[in-house]
Amino acid sequence: AKFVTSASNGLNTSYEPGKTFDVYRSFLTANPDVQFIENVDIGAEHADRAIESLGMTGKVFTIGWNSSKGQLDAIEKGIQVAQLDQRWPDQAAFGAPACAQFLKNGVILPNTQTLKAVTKDGVAEARKELDATMQQK
């Protein structure tokens, strides 16, 4: 595999959907041989949108972190191969006891969180979990 970016020259995206989309469109236009993008947080669904808008579906694929409807849609379309769900409710629930243990006893608790890879066959279940988390029906 040939990596176009590295830790020292990574792509600078943001939490703003429009800017992230534009960064990915520019990146893919300048690097038409890219085949795979890994992204975190909101970025993957906007990389997916950029791939689709440039007509690169089936040529460029993604994987992304955290659950979103846009990523689940892209998995169903075959653009995104998986979503790595960090399980937000578990993340949130861990913070209070971890802080309490550290502040009271100086103990750093090990991370008990498990990562859940969501592929095409798990999209329906992931949508239900996301809707429950976001209280969207």
Residue locations for each model-derived region?
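A residue-level marker of the well-folded mature domains of exported/periplasmic proteins
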Residues: A1-K137
